[in-house]
UniProtKB/Swiss-Prot annotation:
Keywords, comma-separated and alphabetical: Membrane, Thylakoid, Transmembrane, Transmembrane helix
Membrane topology, from the record: Single-pass membrane protein
Gene Ontology BP terms: photosynthesis
Organism (species): Nostoc sp. (strain PCC 7120 / SAG 25.82 / UTEX 2576)
Regions crossing the membrane: 21-41
Pfam families: PSI_PsaJ
Identification of the protein by name: PsaJ-like protein asl3190
Location of this chain's protein in the cell: Cellular thylakoid membrane
Family of the protein in this entry: Belongs to the PsaJ family.
Location, primary (coarse class): membrane
GO CC annotation, single: photosystem I
Length: 50
């Protein structure tokens, strides 16, 4: 029983260390995509239509 609790703690700590990493990576990809899109197709606020 003690070994299974140790494994559960190990897996839980791996999950806690992986979730923030995945969150930072996914947010970085999303904002990078947004920035590149706005670089290629600028916002109409700075380039208004005539």
């Amino acid at each position: 029983m003690n070994k299974s609790q140790d494994k559960e703690k190990k897996y839980f700590l791996e999950y806690l260390s992986l979730a923030p990493v995945l969150a930072v990576i996914s947010i970085s990809v999303a904002f990078s995509t947004w920035a590149i899109f706005n670089y290629i197709f600028p916002d109409l606020l700075f380039h208004p239509l005539p």
